[in-house]
Amino acid sequence: MVEVKKTTKTKSTEEKAPKITKATKEKTSDKTALKAKTPKTKVSDKAESTPKKASVKTSAKAEKINVEKTEKVEKVNVEKVSIKRESSSKDVQKADFSNIKELNSKIFEFEKNYDQAIFDCILSERASRRQGTHKVKNRAEVSGTGKKPWKQKGTGKARAGSLRNPIFVGGGRAFGPSVNRNYKISINKKVRLNALMASLFALAKSNSVLLKTFSLEKPSTKDLVEELRKINASNLKRILLVSDDKNIFLSARNLKNVKVTKVTSLMIEDLVAADLLILSNENIKYLEGLIK
Protein backbone atom coordinates (compact mmCIF):
# COMPACT_ATOMS: atom_id res chain seq x y z
CA MET A 1 0.00 0.00 0.00
CA VAL A 2 2.75 2.32 0.83
CA GLU A 3 4.39 1.77 -2.46
CA VAL A 4 1.16 2.42 -4.29
CA LYS A 5 0.71 5.73 -2.54
CA LYS A 6 4.17 6.76 -3.43
CA THR A 7 3.59 5.96 -7.01
CA THR A 8 0.38 7.89 -7.07
CA LYS A 9 2.05 10.84 -5.50
CA THR A 10 4.79 10.79 -8.01
CA LYS A 11 2.32 10.40 -10.80
CA SER A 12 0.25 13.28 -9.52
CA THR A 13 3.28 15.45 -9.15
CA GLU A 14 4.49 14.49 -12.56
CA GLU A 15 1.05 15.11 -14.03
CA LYS A 16 0.58 18.42 -12.21
CA ALA A 17 4.00 19.82 -13.02
CA PRO A 18 3.72 19.87 -16.76
CA LYS A 19 0.25 21.42 -16.61
CA ILE A 20 1.51 24.29 -14.47
CA THR A 21 4.46 24.92 -16.75
CA LYS A 22 2.31 25.02 -19.86
CA ALA A 23 -0.18 27.42 -18.34
CA THR A 24 2.52 29.63 -17.01
CA LYS A 25 4.27 29.59 -20.32
CA GLU A 26 1.07 30.49 -22.14
CA LYS A 27 0.27 33.20 -19.61
CA THR A 28 3.76 34.64 -19.76
CA SER A 29 3.72 34.53 -23.52
CA ASP A 30 0.34 36.28 -23.56
CA LYS A 31 1.58 38.92 -21.11
CA THR A 32 4.72 39.58 -23.09
CA ALA A 33 2.67 39.77 -26.26
CA LEU A 34 0.28 42.22 -24.66
CA LYS A 35 3.16 44.30 -23.28
CA ALA A 36 4.82 44.30 -26.64
CA LYS A 37 1.60 45.19 -28.39
CA THR A 38 0.32 47.90 -26.12
CA PRO A 39 3.08 50.52 -26.55
CA LYS A 40 3.32 49.87 -30.24
CA THR A 41 -0.38 50.30 -30.69
CA LYS A 42 -0.31 53.49 -28.64
CA VAL A 43 2.55 54.90 -30.67
CA SER A 44 0.91 53.88 -33.89
CA ASP A 45 -2.36 55.43 -32.77
CA LYS A 46 -0.56 58.63 -31.91
CA ALA A 47 1.36 58.57 -35.15
CA GLU A 48 -1.84 57.93 -37.06
CA SER A 49 -3.82 60.51 -35.14
CA THR A 50 -1.27 63.33 -35.32
CA PRO A 51 -0.81 63.45 -39.09
CA LYS A 52 -4.55 63.50 -39.53
CA LYS A 53 -4.80 66.58 -37.32
CA ALA A 54 -1.78 68.11 -39.02
CA SER A 55 -3.20 67.37 -42.43
CA VAL A 56 -6.46 69.08 -41.51
CA LYS A 57 -4.58 72.11 -40.20
CA THR A 58 -2.24 72.21 -43.16
CA SER A 59 -5.11 71.84 -45.58
CA ALA A 60 -6.98 74.68 -43.86
CA LYS A 61 -3.83 76.81 -43.89
CA ALA A 62 -3.18 75.95 -47.51
CA GLU A 63 -6.74 76.93 -48.41
CA LYS A 64 -6.32 80.23 -46.55
CA ILE A 65 -2.99 80.89 -48.27
CA ASN A 66 -4.46 80.04 -51.66
CA VAL A 67 -7.40 82.38 -51.02
CA GLU A 68 -5.03 85.15 -49.92
CA LYS A 69 -2.81 84.55 -52.93
CA THR A 70 -5.76 84.65 -55.31
CA GLU A 71 -6.99 87.87 -53.70
CA LYS A 72 -3.51 89.38 -53.98
CA VAL A 73 -3.18 88.30 -57.59
CA GLU A 74 -6.58 89.77 -58.40
CA LYS A 75 -5.61 93.03 -56.71
CA VAL A 76 -2.29 93.18 -58.55
CA ASN A 77 -3.95 92.48 -61.86
CA VAL A 78 -6.47 95.24 -61.27
CA GLU A 79 -3.70 97.67 -60.38
CA LYS A 80 -1.72 96.71 -63.46
CA VAL A 81 -4.73 97.23 -65.69
CA SER A 82 -5.39 100.62 -64.14
CA ILE A 83 -1.72 101.59 -64.58
CA LYS A 84 -1.82 100.55 -68.20
CA ARG A 85 -4.93 102.63 -68.78
CA GLU A 86 -3.34 105.61 -67.10
CA SER A 87 -0.15 105.23 -69.13
CA SER A 88 -2.11 104.96 -72.36
CA SER A 89 -3.99 108.11 -71.45
CA LYS A 90 -0.77 109.89 -70.50
CA ASP A 91 1.05 108.92 -73.67
CA VAL A 92 -0.64 111.83 -75.41
CA GLN A 93 -2.69 109.76 -77.81
CA LYS A 94 -0.30 109.41 -80.69
CA ALA A 95 -3.30 108.87 -82.97
CA ASP A 96 -4.11 112.59 -82.60
CA PHE A 97 -0.97 113.41 -84.61
CA SER A 98 -2.07 111.39 -87.62
CA ASN A 99 -1.77 114.19 -90.17
CA ILE A 100 -0.79 111.84 -92.99
CA LYS A 101 -2.77 113.90 -95.50
CA GLU A 102 -0.54 116.88 -94.81
CA LEU A 103 2.62 114.76 -95.09
CA ASN A 104 2.63 114.55 -98.86
CA SER A 105 6.38 114.91 -99.06
CA LYS A 106 8.66 112.28 -100.59
CA ILE A 107 10.52 112.09 -97.30
CA PHE A 108 7.78 110.03 -95.68
CA GLU A 109 7.35 107.64 -98.61
CA PHE A 110 10.68 105.91 -98.10
CA GLU A 111 9.35 102.47 -97.20
CA LYS A 112 12.65 100.58 -97.15
CA ASN A 113 14.04 99.61 -93.78
CA TYR A 114 17.75 100.22 -93.28
CA ASP A 115 18.44 98.93 -89.78
CA GLN A 116 22.15 98.47 -90.39
CA ALA A 117 22.51 102.00 -91.75
CA ILE A 118 20.72 103.41 -88.70
CA PHE A 119 22.97 101.38 -86.40
CA ASP A 120 26.15 102.53 -88.14
CA CYS A 121 25.07 106.16 -88.06
CA ILE A 122 24.30 106.02 -84.34
CA LEU A 123 27.74 104.51 -83.70
CA SER A 124 29.44 107.25 -85.70
CA GLU A 125 27.45 109.98 -83.93
CA ARG A 126 28.38 108.63 -80.52
CA ALA A 127 32.02 108.21 -81.48
CA SER A 128 32.24 111.76 -82.81
CA ARG A 129 31.25 113.10 -79.37
CA ARG A 130 34.40 111.71 -77.79
CA GLN A 131 36.98 114.44 -77.38
CA GLY A 132 40.04 112.23 -77.11
CA THR A 133 41.84 114.52 -74.65
CA HIS A 134 43.01 111.69 -72.39
CA LYS A 135 46.72 111.42 -71.63
CA VAL A 136 49.02 109.27 -69.49
CA LYS A 137 52.80 109.33 -69.08
CA ASN A 138 54.96 106.65 -70.61
CA ARG A 139 58.36 105.52 -69.29
CA ALA A 140 60.12 108.42 -70.99
CA GLU A 141 57.89 111.07 -69.42
CA VAL A 142 57.50 109.77 -65.87
CA SER A 143 59.79 111.27 -63.20
CA GLY A 144 62.57 109.11 -61.80
CA THR A 145 66.23 108.27 -62.08
CA GLY A 146 67.80 106.53 -65.00
CA LYS A 147 70.35 104.71 -62.87
CA LYS A 148 70.51 100.93 -62.96
CA PRO A 149 68.85 99.83 -59.67
CA TRP A 150 71.18 96.87 -58.99
CA LYS A 151 74.01 95.08 -60.73
CA GLN A 152 73.33 92.74 -63.59
CA LYS A 153 74.51 89.50 -61.95
CA GLY A 154 75.07 88.07 -58.53
CA THR A 155 72.04 89.33 -56.61
CA GLY A 156 69.64 86.50 -57.45
CA LYS A 157 67.08 89.02 -58.68
CA ALA A 158 65.83 89.47 -62.19
CA ARG A 159 67.88 91.92 -64.21
CA ALA A 160 66.55 95.48 -64.38
CA GLY A 161 67.84 98.53 -66.19
CA SER A 162 65.51 101.31 -64.95
CA LEU A 163 63.00 101.95 -62.19
CA ARG A 164 60.78 103.76 -64.69
CA ASN A 165 59.98 100.44 -66.31
CA PRO A 166 56.19 99.75 -66.46
CA ILE A 167 56.63 96.64 -64.29
CA PHE A 168 57.66 98.77 -61.28
CA VAL A 169 55.38 100.83 -59.06
CA GLY A 170 55.64 104.45 -60.16
CA GLY A 171 56.83 103.46 -63.60
CA GLY A 172 55.46 104.67 -66.90
CA ARG A 173 52.32 103.34 -68.53
CA ALA A 174 52.82 100.89 -71.37
CA PHE A 175 50.65 101.47 -74.46
CA GLY A 176 48.50 104.09 -72.74
CA PRO A 177 46.07 106.46 -74.49
CA SER A 178 47.73 109.21 -76.44
CA VAL A 179 46.77 112.84 -76.86
CA ASN A 180 44.16 114.04 -79.38
CA ARG A 181 43.10 110.62 -80.56
CA ASN A 182 40.45 110.72 -83.26
CA TYR A 183 37.55 108.37 -82.57
CA LYS A 184 35.43 109.42 -85.53
CA ILE A 185 33.92 106.74 -87.74
CA SER A 186 33.38 107.80 -91.33
CA ILE A 187 29.98 107.10 -92.88
CA ASN A 188 29.12 107.37 -96.56
CA LYS A 189 26.65 110.09 -97.54
CA LYS A 190 24.24 107.63 -99.12
CA VAL A 191 24.23 105.45 -96.01
CA ARG A 192 23.46 108.44 -93.80
CA LEU A 193 20.73 109.61 -96.15
CA ASN A 194 19.12 106.16 -96.15
CA ALA A 195 19.21 106.08 -92.35
CA LEU A 196 17.66 109.56 -92.17
CA MET A 197 14.82 108.71 -94.55
CA ALA A 198 14.15 105.35 -92.87
CA SER A 199 13.91 106.94 -89.42
CA LEU A 200 11.58 109.68 -90.70
CA PHE A 201 9.36 107.08 -92.36
CA ALA A 202 9.19 105.10 -89.11
CA LEU A 203 8.03 108.21 -87.23
CA ALA A 204 5.41 109.00 -89.87
CA LYS A 205 4.17 105.40 -89.85
CA SER A 206 3.65 105.53 -86.07
CA ASN A 207 1.76 108.89 -86.39
CA SER A 208 4.49 110.73 -84.48
CA VAL A 209 5.10 113.65 -86.86
CA LEU A 210 3.43 117.02 -86.37
CA LEU A 211 3.61 119.97 -88.76
CA LYS A 212 3.64 123.14 -86.69
CA THR A 213 5.73 126.28 -86.42
CA PHE A 214 6.56 127.43 -82.90
CA SER A 215 7.46 131.05 -82.27
CA LEU A 216 7.96 132.93 -79.00
CA GLU A 217 8.48 136.65 -78.48
CA LYS A 218 10.86 136.08 -75.57
CA PRO A 219 12.48 133.11 -73.83
CA SER A 220 9.87 131.59 -71.51
CA THR A 221 9.69 127.97 -70.42
CA LYS A 222 6.16 128.48 -69.15
CA ASP A 223 4.92 129.68 -72.54
CA LEU A 224 6.56 126.74 -74.31
CA VAL A 225 4.94 124.29 -71.89
CA GLU A 226 1.57 125.92 -72.58
CA GLU A 227 2.09 125.53 -76.32
CA LEU A 228 2.92 121.86 -75.87
CA ARG A 229 -0.09 121.40 -73.61
CA LYS A 230 -2.38 122.80 -76.28
CA ILE A 231 -1.37 120.01 -78.64
CA ASN A 232 -1.52 117.38 -75.82
CA ALA A 233 2.22 116.75 -75.96
CA SER A 234 3.42 117.94 -72.56
CA ASN A 235 3.46 114.45 -71.00
CA LEU A 236 5.54 112.75 -73.68
CA LYS A 237 8.98 111.49 -72.67
CA ARG A 238 10.93 112.61 -75.74
CA ILE A 239 9.92 115.50 -77.97
CA LEU A 240 12.20 116.54 -80.81
CA LEU A 241 11.45 120.09 -81.89
CA VAL A 242 13.17 121.25 -85.07
CA SER A 243 13.53 125.02 -85.05
CA ASP A 244 16.05 127.80 -85.65
CA ASP A 245 14.45 130.21 -83.19
CA LYS A 246 16.80 131.15 -80.37
CA ASN A 247 13.94 131.92 -77.99
CA ILE A 248 12.59 128.40 -78.33
CA PHE A 249 16.04 126.96 -77.75
CA LEU A 250 16.47 128.98 -74.56
CA SER A 251 12.95 128.15 -73.38
CA ALA A 252 13.46 124.40 -73.76
CA ARG A 253 16.82 124.20 -71.99
CA ASN A 254 15.18 123.42 -68.65
CA LEU A 255 12.77 120.79 -70.02
CA LYS A 256 14.19 117.29 -69.82
CA ASN A 257 11.69 115.82 -72.30
CA VAL A 258 12.17 118.44 -75.03
CA LYS A 259 15.16 118.78 -77.31
CA VAL A 260 15.49 121.60 -79.82
CA THR A 261 17.77 121.19 -82.82
CA LYS A 262 18.33 122.69 -86.22
CA VAL A 263 17.49 120.93 -89.47
CA THR A 264 21.10 120.97 -90.51
CA SER A 265 22.16 119.12 -87.36
CA LEU A 266 19.51 116.41 -87.16
CA MET A 267 20.86 113.26 -85.56
CA ILE A 268 19.64 109.74 -86.29
CA GLU A 269 19.78 108.79 -82.61
CA ASP A 270 17.41 111.63 -81.70
CA LEU A 271 14.97 110.64 -84.44
CA VAL A 272 14.93 107.00 -83.38
CA ALA A 273 14.39 107.86 -79.70
CA ALA A 274 11.75 110.56 -80.30
CA ASP A 275 8.10 110.03 -79.37
CA LEU A 276 7.09 113.11 -81.32
CA LEU A 277 8.80 115.06 -84.10
CA ILE A 278 7.66 118.64 -84.64
CA LEU A 279 8.60 120.09 -88.01
CA SER A 280 7.74 123.13 -90.09
CA ASN A 281 7.12 123.32 -93.82
CA GLU A 282 10.46 125.05 -94.32
CA ASN A 283 12.24 122.16 -92.64
CA ILE A 284 10.48 119.67 -94.91
CA LYS A 285 11.58 121.62 -97.96
CA TYR A 286 15.17 121.48 -96.76
CA LEU A 287 14.95 117.70 -96.25
CA GLU A 288 13.40 117.29 -99.69
CA GLY A 289 16.41 119.06 -101.15
CA LEU A 290 18.68 116.34 -99.72
CA ILE A 291 16.97 113.65 -101.79
CA LYS A 292 17.45 115.37 -105.14
Curated annotation (Swiss-Prot):
Region Disordered: start-end pairs: 1-59, 132-158
Protein name: Large ribosomal subunit protein uL4
UniProt entry keywords in alphabetical sequence: Ribonucleoprotein, Ribosomal protein, RNA-binding, rRNA-binding
Name of the encoding gene: rplD
GO biological process terms on file: translation
Binding partners and assembly: Part of the 50S ribosomal subunit.
Family: Belongs to the universal ribosomal protein uL4 family.
Pfam family, one: Ribosomal_L4
Gene Ontology MF, one: rRNA binding
Gene Ontology cellular component annotations, sorted alphabetically: ribonucleoprotein complex; ribosome
Function description: One of the primary rRNA binding proteins, this protein initially binds near the 5'-end of the 23S rRNA. It is important during the early stages of 50S assembly. It makes multiple contacts with different domains of the 23S rRNA in the assembled 50S subunit and ribosome.
Keyword Hydrolase: no
Keyword RNA-binding in annotation: yes
Xref: SUPFAM superfamilies: Ribosomal protein L4
Organism: Mycoplasmopsis pulmonis (strain UAB CTIP) (Mycoplasma pulmonis)
InterPro entries: Ribosomal_uL4, Ribosomal_uL4-like, Ribosomal_uL4_dom_sf
Biased amino acid composition, Basic and acidic residues: 1-33, 42-51
